[in-house]
């Protein structure tokens, strides 16, 4: 029987103590309210009803650190209370109008959010850990701060990202991970490497897979074009493609020379959900993400149609929208059945950014729940975790370099806009290697410098600069972490060190000795 491996990738960059709105902590609070808590509620309902449809959830280390942070928990509680008050105000304003149903829905949603968060004692990480212990999900890890693996300038820098990600996972989930989400599905094989800007030396470098295997990781995921050739898919919101026929290679389990096993993203199921023109989120009944109430900032309108201007958006009808998710779930499972019929021994890998569901596509979590319920009783397709999917026979494969970004290469993260970013990253990585080797700086200073370097390396900063979504914020953030890093190496005062330790506090186990990788 064909196996279906759903993989959700949950990630947000480090925003704790770095602004509130529109690009700071509120972006995390939105994802907590609209994606992570609703997903936990789905898992709680399925567990209570004995519905078995396992899937894989990647929680990046930097996201797990923030979800577990006391400041973030307190901030989220205040945020959700504020949103409830706004919703109540909207309900009073819109009673007797076409927006009343949406306003009533908003009040109920925020009441449920506060009640659920309180019931969990604010511990979302523990809720996901409980779901894994119950066999509902498989939790996997990633690079510590979502560093872009192929472009990090030194093997030691990539090793520190991987190993810190593994140890952070171990602390939160009390076990060692075997699965790994490659940030941006970006991979580089073993071979000659030349830095895109001045800094690191040229030379032959180990493949990303070799370092993953050394860290105890046994499988990961790549985009379809890395195993089948051809054009890469566009990211969500850009694709205007119709159905694409997968080549046979995407249904195989692949094994690299290092022993790492790899699954490839399935194009058909990807486009059905991600495509802006072809996918489910463009349904006219679903809630419009971009139009917000001018007073409350809440959403009360629907997509209406894909080409509608914001002023043309019609009032949102929650009942009709959530009913539509059932229809779309049946359609998706029908697609899986057709693919399974053509590839009865294959693996259908469907990886998505978790935040697409609930945040960008408000009804998306309800759609996921409907899909899981249908799959639990489906005789043609078996839902499995990625760990189960990679078992058994595999095809020996050599992968090219690439990513799931636009063009299938590194252009989103490496371009004219981001050259200064990479120059600062490489300079800091080289300085960190040297400082770790010399061993002169106090342990606390070196440890905090490592945190600042990890935060500097986050792939979010070049991504946001390239897309223009938050270019000024991204530039401010990477420059801030670079300044902090070099100030620490030059000699920060005890007061300055304490201030940085309070502001940038992830990874208590940060180990500067990881930058001695070659001697290890």
From Swiss-Prot:
Which parts of the sequence bind substrate?
A: 265, 282, 404, 460, 469
Q: Impact of altering residue 271 to A?
A: Nearly no effect on enzymatic activity
| Effect ascribed to mutating residue 463 to A | 0.5% of wild-type enzymatic activity
* Mutagenesis / variant outcome for changing residue 353 to A: Complete loss of enzymatic activity
- Cite a single Pfam family from the UniProt record: Glyco_hydro_57
Quote the catalytic residue positions.
Answer: 184 (nucleophile), 353 (proton donor)
Which effect does the record note for changing residue 184 to A? Complete loss of enzymatic activity. Binds amylose but not glycogen
What the protein does comes down to: Catalyzes the formation of branch points in alpha-glucans by cleavage of an alpha-1,4 glycosidic bond and subsequent transfer of the cleaved-off oligosaccharide to a new alpha-1,6 position. The branch chain-length distribution of the reaction products shows degree of polymerization (DP) of 3 to 13, with two local maxima at DP 7 and DP 11. Exhibits an alpha-retaining catalytic mechanism. Is involved in glycogen biosynthesis. Shows a secondary activity, i.e. the hydrolysis of the substrate, being 4% of the total activity.
Q: Which NCBIfam families match?
A: branchenz_Thermus
Q: Please report the name of this protein according to its UniProt entry.
A: 1,4-alpha-glucan branching enzyme TTHA1902
Provide the species name.
Thermus thermophilus (strain ATCC 27634 / DSM 579 / HB8)
């Amino acid at each position: 029987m064909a196996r279906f491996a759903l993989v959700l990738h949950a990630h947000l960059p480090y925003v704790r103590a770095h602004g509130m709105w529109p690009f700071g902590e509120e972006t995390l609070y939105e994802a907590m309210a609209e994606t992570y808590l609703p997903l936990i509620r789905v898992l709680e309902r399925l567990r209570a009803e004995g519905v078995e449809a396992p899937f894989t959830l990647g929680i990046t280390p930097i996201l797990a650190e923030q979800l577990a942070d006391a400041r973030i928990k307190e901030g989220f509680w205040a945020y959700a209370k504020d949103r409830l008050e706004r919703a109540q105000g909207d309900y009073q304003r819109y009673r007797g109008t076409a927006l009343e149903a949406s306003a009533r829905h908003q009040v109920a949603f925020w009441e449920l959010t506060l009640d659920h968060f309180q019931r969990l004692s604010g511990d979302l990480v523990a809720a996901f850990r409980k779901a894994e212990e119950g066999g509902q999900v498989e939790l996997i890890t990633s690079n510590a701060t979502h560093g872009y693996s192929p472009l990090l300038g030194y093997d030691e820098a990539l090793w520190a990202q991987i190993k810190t990600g593994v140890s952070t996972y171990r602390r939160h989930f009390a076990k060692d991970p075997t699965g790994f989400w490659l940030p941006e599905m970006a991979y580089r094989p073993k071979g000659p490497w030349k830095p895109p800007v001045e800094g690191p030396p040229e030379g032959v470098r180990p493949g990303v897979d070799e370092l993953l295997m050394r860290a105890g990781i046994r499988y990961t995921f790549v985009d379809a074009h890395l195993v089948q050739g051809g054009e890469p898919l566009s990211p969500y919101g850009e694709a205007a493609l119709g159905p694409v026929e997968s080549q046979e290679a995407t249904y195989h389990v692949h094994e690299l020379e290092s022993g790492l096993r790899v699954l490839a993203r399935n194009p058909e199921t990807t486009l059905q959900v991600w495509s802006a023109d072809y996918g489910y989120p463009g349904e006219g009944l679903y809630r419009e993400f971009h139009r917000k109430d001018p007073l409350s900032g809440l959403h009360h309108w629907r997509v209406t149609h894909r080409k509608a201007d914001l002023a043309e958006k019609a009032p949102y009808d929650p009942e009709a929208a959530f009913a539509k998710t059932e229809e779309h779930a049946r359609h998706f499972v029908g697609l899986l059945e057709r693919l399974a019929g053509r590839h009865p021994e294959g693996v259908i890998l469907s990886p998505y950014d978790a935040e697409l569901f609930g945040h960008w596509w408000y009804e998306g979590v309800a759609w996921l729940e409907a899909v899981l319920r249908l799959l639990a009783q489906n005789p043609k397709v078996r839902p499995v975790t990625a760990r189960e999917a990679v078992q058994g026979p595999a095809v020996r494969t050599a992968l090219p370099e690439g990513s799931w970004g636009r063009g299938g290469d590194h252009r989103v993260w490496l371009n004219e806009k981001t050259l200064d970013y990479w120059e600062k990253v490489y300079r800091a990585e080289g300085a960190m290697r040297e400082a770790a080797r010399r061993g002169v700086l106090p342990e606390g200073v070196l440890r905090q410098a490592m945190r600042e370097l990890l935060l500097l390396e986050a792939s979010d900063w070049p991504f946001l600069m390239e897309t223009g979504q938050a270019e000024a914020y991204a530039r401010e953030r990477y420059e801030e972490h670079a300044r902090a890093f070099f100030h620490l190496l030059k000699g920060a005062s005890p007061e300055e060190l304490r201030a940085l330790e309070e502001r940038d506090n992830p990874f208590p186990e940060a180990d500067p000795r990881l930058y001695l990788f070659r001697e290890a």
